[in-house]
Amino acid sequence: MGVGRVTQIMGPVIDVRFNHDELPKINNALVLDVPKKDGTTESLTLEVALELGDDVVRTIAMDSTDGIKRGDDVKDTGRPISVPVGDDTLGRVFNVLGDPIDNAGPIPESVPREPIHRQPPPFDELSTKVEILETGIKVVDLLAPYIKGGKVGLFGGAGVGKTVLIQELINNIAQEHGGISVFAGVGERTREGNDLYFEMSDSGVIKKTAMVFGQMNEPPGARMRVALSGLTMAEYFRDVKGQDVLLFIDNIFRFTQAGSEVSALLGRMPSAVGYQPTLATEMGQLQERITSTMKGSITSIQAVFVPADDYTDPAPATAFAHLDATTNLERKLTEMGIYPAVDPLASTSRALEPSIVGQEHYDVARRVQATLQKYRELQDIIAILGMDELSDEDKSTVERARRIQFFLSQNFHVAEQFTGQKGSYVSVKRTVEDFKDILEGKYDHIPEDAFRLVGSMDDVLEKAKDMGVEV
């Protein structure tokens, strides 16, 4: 393979000149040895981003570029970055290059590796079957159900509970469905990745999970590509093993953010709000590979950070276009102590159709939303005039809506250590029955505080008994 020389270094972006007949292809991985202070050298991987002409390529570094100088030799590997795939990746933690970072020894040489850049599956191989994925989380299963093999976005600003919701979904789906999961940590806090790893080790879920991390402290190159590394591992389980896989990406906004960090250095003109002009293309290249084929499915659950709670920002707006279901987390609900803080009126799913979930489920979900919407409209009147000025019918609607609002909250298994309360998993069937009973007024005599942070109606009745209410 060809050998080039470093001609320019601009932070994470490095220009390399090759001989004319040895010019590497776009997306090829290049390697160079970087001297360290202790006299040793460390290998650094670069990825070719564009050709500048005059036999110079512009590359993005996957690690720190400290210690590199002009004139250093750079080798072309002749292929894109590739990561290990298959059963040997389960229970392990990797970086963007597929190197293990969990101190549990190297991956055997015999393990196959796949390039992280690939084409999406052709149209004639895609599956069109629609099937609901039960999560055990009431608000999700009732109002914005997830589709097996679909894409789900968890939208929310900073600190509203996206990562906790993802951790609960990993836990519930692994425990109840026993599926294989791949977790890609893209530009999030290292502490959260650490916590997640130890939680999953304690619960035994880690044995069925591969984890790939490119965290906040890493250069933009690693954060840009780590989602593709995780997706490549998931694709192998789908295409070769014929399995149903869950792909968790936390956070897809950081993927876009990393692209915008290097975009200007690559010489591209910024577009709206300073994002890269290739925003929609980059998002599409990732999202189009996440799909169900005749062989197996990839169901992806992606946390989407919303900068300054502004949903019109180009990054979350571009992600919206690719999703089958959205779970919107609302700061107002966290202030009321309702967790998960999912907004029942803003969250959507294309699966909430009578032909998919059944007529009863559909009717109950729509009645729940109508009751909550009516309550929202009456809140201004209540704030100005008080409850006494409402008609009897409106009073009854408000009281039921408050019970519904509290009953949409529940304790999570992954939050047990913080709350001291046991987590709960509620089946879709039970969820629909319980909400139907609340709407019909069966539980109007039970105080609304009994509905807070519970699982099924049995827990509410138990709580009411403890309060001294006649059940």
From Swiss-Prot:
Role according to the record: Produces ATP from ADP in the presence of a proton gradient across the membrane. The catalytic sites are hosted primarily by the beta subunits.
Primary enzyme class: translocase
The protein's assembly and partners: F-type ATPases have 2 components, CF(1) - the catalytic core - and CF(0) - the membrane proton channel. CF(1) has five subunits: alpha(3), beta(3), gamma(1), delta(1), epsilon(1). CF(0) has three main subunits: a(1), b(2) and c(9-12). The alpha and beta chains form an alternating ring which encloses part of the gamma chain. CF(1) is attached to CF(0) by a central stalk formed by the gamma and epsilon chains, while a peripheral stalk is formed by the delta and b chains.
Protein's cellular compartments: Cell membrane
CDD domains: ATP-synt_F1_beta_C (cd18110), ATP-synt_F1_beta_N (cd18115), F1-ATPase_beta_CD (cd01133)
Reactions performed catalytically: ATP + H2O + 4 H(+)(in) = ADP + phosphate + 5 H(+)(out)
Pfam family, one: ATP-synt_VA_C
Binding site for ATP: 156-163
Keywords: ATP synthesis, ATP-binding, Cell membrane, CF(1), Hydrogen ion transport, Ion transport, Membrane, Nucleotide-binding, Translocase, Transport
Single GO MF descriptor: ATP hydrolysis activity
Similarity remark: Belongs to the ATPase alpha/beta chains family.
PANTHER family: ATP SYNTHASE (PTHR15184), ATP SYNTHASE SUBUNIT BETA, MITOCHONDRIAL (PTHR15184:SF71)
Protein name listed in UniProt: ATP synthase subunit beta
Database matches in InterPro entries: AAA+_ATPase, ATP-synt_VA_C, ATP_synth_F1_bsu, ATPase_a/bsu_AS, ATPase_alpha/beta_chains, ATPase_F1/V1/A1_a/bsu_N, ATPase_F1/V1/A1_a/bsu_N_sf, ATPase_F1/V1/A1_a/bsu_nucl-bd
Enzyme Commission code(s) on record: 7.1.2.2
Any one of the GO CC terms: plasma membrane
Membrane topology listed for this record: Peripheral membrane protein
